[in-house]
């Protein structure tokens, strides 16, 4: 496991002699869409509100940070997986989109983000591992010499065991049935390209992944706090540092 503190060194391969490197970047944002993740009244902005507010500027903000690192983003695609709880939320438990090409489709991306309303969730653990499974099985680009396949998870809750919600008629077929099998899925991804950035509490599911998966950065969040303690700049920098 690579830690946040040594992320830049661990991921390495920085530009030499001031010459920028071109990157083809795919990102999947796995967003906990349960009730605690959004707040329209509190003084501290929670993560869904933050993502909504900055969706239209995400490409330009990300590109600016990458340019400062002598890294040129030749292509950026972003996919959304918004997750809740299959037993509690049924058909609304998972929203999975195709990739949005940015900045060309930034208006569609913004509309998608704005359609997410934090609601439901039932008990405190959520079906975040199923969301991660969807992300791993994305149709990643095969173009470009310098590819990055980045999964970012935002949640303030632990996870159910895989298959916890399998009795729901809406539970997807073909999901892994154990941590070991999900780990095998992760191992099939290109090790040079894959990155996992977890904004998640040090609780069920996530702690196992952060301790056992390669190319993983875990920035602990406060359980039940909606990631209100994380600023947009911190989140953006953590994502950029993983590329």
Predicted feature residues:
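Acidic, low-complexity intrinsically disordered regions
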Residues: 1-243
């Amino acid at each position: 496991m690579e830690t946040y503190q040594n992320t830049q060194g661990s991921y390495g391969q920085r530009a030499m002699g001031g010459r920028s490197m071109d990157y083809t970047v795919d990102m999947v944002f796995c967003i906990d869409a349960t009730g605690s993740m959004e707040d329209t009244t509190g003084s501290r902005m929670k993560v869904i509100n933050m993502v909504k507010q900055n969706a239209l500027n995400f490409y330009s903000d990300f590109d600016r940070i990458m340019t400062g690192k002598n890294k040129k983003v030749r292509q950026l695609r972003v996919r959304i997986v918004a997750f809740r709880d299959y037993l509690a939320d049924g058909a609304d438990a998972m929203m999975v989109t195709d990739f949005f090409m940015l900045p060309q489709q930034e208006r569609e991306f913004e509309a998608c983000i704005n359609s997410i309303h934090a609601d439901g969730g039932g008990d405190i653990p959520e079906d975040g591992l199923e969301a991660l499974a969807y992300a791993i099985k994305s149709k990643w680009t095969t173009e470009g010499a310098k590819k990055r396949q980045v999964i970012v998870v935002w949640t303030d809750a632990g996870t159910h065991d895989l298959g916890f919600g399998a009795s729901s008629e809406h539970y997807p077929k073909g999901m892994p049935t154990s941590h070991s099998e999900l780990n095998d899925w992760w191992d099939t991804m290109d090790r040079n390209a894959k990155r996992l950035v977890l904004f998640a509490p040090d609780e069920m599911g996530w702690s196992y992944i952060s301790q056992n998966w390669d190319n993983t950065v875990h920035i602990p969040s406060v359980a039940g706090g909606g990631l209100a303690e994380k600023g947009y700049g911190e989140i953006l920098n953590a994502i950029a540092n993983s590329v």
